Amino acid sequence: MSPIILSITIIAYFMILFAISYIAGHKADNEGFFVGNRKSAWYIVAFAMIGSTISGVTFVSVPGMVQASGFSYLQMVLGFIVGQFIIAFILVPLFYRMNLISIYEYLENRFGASSYKTGAWFFFISKMLGAAVRLFLVCLTLQLLIFEPFHIPFIINVILTVLIVWLYTFRGGVKSLIWTDVLKTFCLVVSVVLCIYYIASSLHLNFSGLVSTISDSDLSKMFFFDDVNDKRYFFKQFLAGVFTVIAMNGLDQDMMQRNLSCKNFRDSQKNMITSGISQFFVILLFLMLGVLLYTFTARQGIENPGKSDELFPMIATGNYFPGIVGILFIIGLIASAYSAAGSALTALTTSFTVDILNAHKKDEAALSKIRKHVHIGMAFVMGIVIFVFNLLNNTSVIDAIYTLASYTYGPILGLFAFGIFTKKQVYDPYIPLVAILSPALCYVLQSNSEAWFDGYQISYELLILNAAFTFLGLCLLIKRKSSAAPINSSLIKKH
């Protein structure tokens, strides 16, 4: 595709994005930035959440996954749905009852300052690296399609990308994010549906032919029960999906900031359940698209790219279809990647301001000043991390993110699980040590699992092991004659 056409498409999208961001975030105060003033309609948040769970990584990588993994990803997505129900009926009422700005305030109330800072710092590392990986993917794609033809270096690409994310989130925060996520969801769903339509048309498939082509393909196998050593094994994927969504959605300030913007916890529960079920069908569309892409390359004799992540971009922008397919791909990619990055930047700003600096205890004017400075700082750090990823990239992006989450979200999951399901008090100053040792032990296990466990490969279930080690470590720190954890009444507010 012509770089000029792509540039015009991107500029048009950003004009719409900035207009929505300005209208939604107009006159937003600090509460509006952090939790949307808790006035968001649940059905708007639910629609927005469908898109917020889909990043540029999903948009680009999931269609290419079908060659190696078939539809096995849906096994994990089924686990996501179960995890969403757990979040809706356990975590959401708890967070609303405590009237939290940052969900990691719960750890201070339950254990103490050390666990609070541990949770906040682990989130900071997780979200910063995860957001950087996602933006790195879109930067690579834009570099190939737009910046490279104009001989613009990668560093300029990164600077412009981060600057755009900062600009449309600096004013409205969560209030802006919800409405920009609505735009993102609409663009994503329309893009993938129309891409399926145009590719099916080029293959001369009507609806029944489309369904039979996908269902008859070896790439559409969904359930894997045969080999427990296979990374696609059902119970590995399903259980990993349950715990991954609890950790990456329920215990993630980025995702929960939208849920906490609903008027009350019952509205938030409706949002969680609706968006969780809808996500299954959206992911199914991406996998269907992947089967069609591989079917198309096979019939046309097109050599598949070296990396599965490159399949969708190569076909969509390679003049194999009408130009609208390439435009739809770019809109979908930009919508997913920039919205996810903006959400992460807002969450990082909130967590660092509230959890690390404790600035929420200051007056409104001082808080606004600190928040704006932190927002700039987070954008700068994100740009640096993206550039470093460009130097280190050597693995599938989606695997890298889930593996990363297993190491960094595991201690957070273990901390919350211990706090919610036990009433024991622990020696708070030693909690950071447990949070560091648990991922280290998991790394040793994962590196040697095949040799130690007769060929068994640890994959996404690493998150469960990590949380379990953290939980056991906290058991070793239980105080003698412990009683129920004290509750800070100042944090509790009934809704």
Regions inferred by a protein language model and the residue ranges of each:
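Membrane-embedded helix-loop-helix hairpins and adjacent transmembrane boundary segments
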Residues: 1-495
